[in-house]
Regions:
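Short, glycine-rich nucleotide/cofactor-binding loops
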Residues: 41-51, 125-128
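Heptad-repeat coiled-coil amphipathic alpha-helices that mediate oligomerization/assembly
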Residues: 14-34
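Short internal beta-strands
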Residues: 68-74, 151-152
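Glycine-rich loop at the start of a catalytic domain that most often binds anionic cofactors/ligands
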Residues: 80-89
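A charged, amphipathic interaction segment
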Residues: 115-172, 176
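Histidine-anchored nucleotide/phosphate-binding helix
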Residues: 52-65, 70
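Helix-enriched interaction subdomains in cytosolic or periplasmic regions
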Residues: 1-18
Length: 190
């Protein structure tokens, strides 16, 4: 399948470009296999850098016409927790792939204040490139009818209550999510 990519004059992909490309690719797959209309994603990490992949993938799949569910378990619950969702941070310690304007030794990244600095840098870089915020991606996911499923066992283990999560979250255990995943043609663990 041929996809129109950005021209040299416009070298950055926008969120709309990504959604269009994914929609075209998924439409091609669905045309070949009409049963391939479901996606299941597991979000198990709750830092700013790990919140983006499951939400971008989920909204792209839903925008392409796929029934999509994201299962938030363990620290992934932070993404949908009312108190934590707006305060997600990225930790540069032990993250050698994290792009920094100036290479820094691990000792420097462990200094007080570096987590806040790295988080601010990531948010500003994403904003400069018109990448939606986590709050916006969550709103988009709900508008696109993505099922946001909080792991009930993890909620119980961590001592949370269902009231502590954003509106629109369903609560279920791993067995219920496995039923969703079993019927899905795309299953991702992020």
């Amino acid at each position: 399948m041929s996809v129109d990519l950005p021209t040299p004059e416009r070298s950055l992909l926008t969120e709309q470009d990504v959604r269009r490309i994914v929609r075209e690719e998924v439409a091609g797959v669905i045309a070949k296999d009409p049963g391939s209309r479901q996606a299941a994603i597991i979000a198990s990490k709750g830092t700013l850098d790990w919140a983006y992949p499951p939400l971008i993938l989920a909204t792209a799949a839903a925008a392409a016409g796929m029934q999509t569910a994201v299962f938030f378990t363990f620290y992934g619950l932070n993404i949908i927790h009312k108190d934590f969702a707006r305060k997600l941070k990225v930790d540069p310690v032990g993250n050698p792939a994290m792009p920094m304007p100036v290479p820094m030794p691990d000792l420097v990244t462990a200094m007080p204040g570096m987590v806040s600095l790295a988080s601010k840098m990531m948010r500003s870089r994403f904003a400069r490139h018109n990448v939606a915020s986590i709050a916006t991606l969550l709103d988009s996911a709900r508008e696109l009818d993505v099922r946001l499923i909080g792991c009930q066992m993890t909620i119980d283990v961590f001592g949370y209550t269902q009231d502590e999560f954003i509106d629109g979250v369903e609560f279920a255990g791993a067995a219920a999510f496995m039923s969703v995943a079993r019927r899905s043609n795309v299953t991702l663990f992020v």
